[in-house]
Amino acid sequence: MTKKVYFNHDGGVDDLVSLFLLLQMENVQLIGVSTIGADCYLEPSLSASVKIINRFSNEDIQVAPSYERGKNPFPKEWRMHAFFMDALPILNEPVKHVASNVSDKEAFEDIIQTLKRQSEKVTLLFTGPLTDLAKALQKDSSIVQYIEKLVWMGGTFLPKGNVEEPEHDGSAEWNAYWDPEAVKIVFDSDIEIDMVALESTNQVPLTLDVRQRWANERQYTGIDFLGVSYAAVPPLTHFITNSTYFLWDVLTAAYIGNKDLVHSIEKKVDVISYGPSQGKTFECKDGRKINVINHVDNNAFFDYITALAKKVN
C-alpha cells in the first residue's frame, strides 16, 4: 500500500540523500518537500533539492523554503555541506524533464495547504528541527486531523546527547536543541509521533567498510551518488567524536519505506525548553506517549538503502 509522505529537511548530506532514496521507494508517494536553514544554508539546500527531484524522478514537486530561525545555530562547518551537494556534477547535468522548482510559498504555508488538499491522511517526515511544523500548528491547528503520524529524527533518552556547546550540559540531540520551543509545541499537540532517536541512529555510523562497499559498486549511478555524497563527511574510524557522521536521516527515511528494519518502545515523554538542558527529551509519568525507535538491524538497513540506490542506473 502506498503512503503519502510530506518531507521537511535541513539540507545536510543525509537529508539530501534521504530525498533521493524516498524518490526510489515504490510504496511512498512524496507529495511535498520543504527545507529549513538549520544544518545547512538555505539557498544551496533549496537548489540541491530541486536538482535531486529533477535528476532522479519525474515528480512535479515544488520545494518550499523556510525562513525560520532557531535559538541555537548549527556549526558553520556542518552547514557548508549543502554547497558541496549542490555542486555535484551528477546534479548539474542537463536533464530532459524539469518539473520541480522552488515554491513561492513558505514551508509552513506549504505544509498547511498540502495537507488540506489530501483525501487521505499524510505521514510527516521531519529530519531536521520541528520549527516549521510548530509554526503550521500555531497558524492552523486543524491540520492535525490530516496527519497520520509524524516521523521525526530527533531527541534522545541516553545520558549524553550529541550537543557539545558552551552553556549546555550535553544532554540534548541537535535537532531538538536548535529549536526546543518548537519541540514543546509539537509534543503538546495530538499528533502521533515516531521518534528516531540517537539510540538507533548511533547504530548506523558511516564507516570505512560502508564507503568501500559503495566504491565497489559505483558502476550503478545511484550508488556512485551515495559514495560521492558521503565523501564530504568524516567516517567513524577509531572512536566517536563530535563530528563522526551517522546516517541519522537516512535511517529515518528508510523506516518510512520499511518499518521492519527497526524495533521501537513506547515512552511517556516531555522536553525542556529553556536553560542549560534545553532540548533535552526526558521520560515522565505525565508526559505524552511516543514510539521511540531504539534498535535497527544494521545489515538489513544498509542492504535496503543500497538496493534502493541501485534502482538508478
Where does each model-flagged region fall?
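Short, surface-exposed, polar/charged, turn-prone segments marking secondary-structure boundaries
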Residues: V33-T35, N58-V63, I90-P94, W152-G154, ...
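General secondary-structure edge motif
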Residues: T2, V13, L91, V95, ...
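Conformational coupling and interaction surfaces
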Residues: T2, F20-L30, W174-Y177, I185-N313
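Short, mixed-charge, low-aromatic patches
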Residues: T2-D10, P65-G70, I90-E93, K139-D140, ...
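Metal-dependent C-N hydrolase catalytic cores
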Residues: L46-R117, G275, C284-V296, T306-K310
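Short, mixed-charge aromatic SLiMs
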Residues: C40-P44, N72, T156-K160, V271-G287
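Active-site histidine-anchored catalytic micro-motif
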Residues: T2-K51, H97-M195, T201, L208
